[in-house]
Amino acid sequence: MNQSIQISVAKKTDADSIVKFYSELSNTSKEKFAPHDFTFEYLSDHILDNSNYVTIIAKNSITKEVIGYAVSQLWIFDYDMIRWKNYGVLIDNTEKNYACFAPSVLDNFQHLGIGSMLLSETKEILSRLNFVNLILWGGVKCYNIAAVKFYLKNDFILMGHFDYNGGNYDMCLKINA
């Protein structure tokens, strides 16, 4: 399957395809994945081609359909820094040590290694930008067992638990470990 998957940095010209991707996620997946607004305007004006974000897409090489999307924000929200401080982790956005990560793959393409491919490309880019740690954007829902297993398989470490619209885990990955 990996032979027919193309991984690349998303561009402004991919905005329509990313909006279509998001519209094709199941409602269950949308409940678990909503790091930002998925309108064409928001993607074009605030996310794509913005130096504060790294966006990676996975496309079906044959149909050119976006089947996976990962966005990394190159700074951490203040309220997240406060929560992470409770785990003994001091995050300072001026040091550019931490980025946050939110991936998703269309339901019928999950469990094929696409998420790992998105993560690998993200890590490579963030490493070149001298980032050291990758945390989950908004954590991961505790009931999302498949995602929790994915992160653990990919060497994320469980750091703590918080409540926001239900239980969530905070996890962290050393990018160059």
Task: Label every PLM stretch briefly.
Residues 32-61:
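Active-site rim helix/loop that mediates acceptor-substrate recognition in acyltransferases
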Residues 63-102:
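Conserved acyl-donor/pantetheine-binding loop and adjacent beta-alpha core of acyl/acetyltransferases
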Residues 4-20:
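A short beta-loop-alpha structural element at the N-terminal edge
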Residues 111-124, 149, 153:
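Conserved acetyl-CoA-binding loop-helix of GNAT-fold acetyltransferases
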Residues 110, 135-147, 164-168:
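Conserved beta-strand-loop-alpha-helix junction that forms the acyl-donor binding cleft
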Residues 148, 153, 159-177:
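C-terminal "cap" of GNAT-fold acetyltransferases
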Residues 97, 126-140:
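Conserved GNAT acetyl-CoA-binding A-motif
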Residues 88-91, 100-111, 139-141:
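A short, internal acetyl-CoA/4′-phosphopantetheine-binding micro-motif in the GNAT/acyltransferase core
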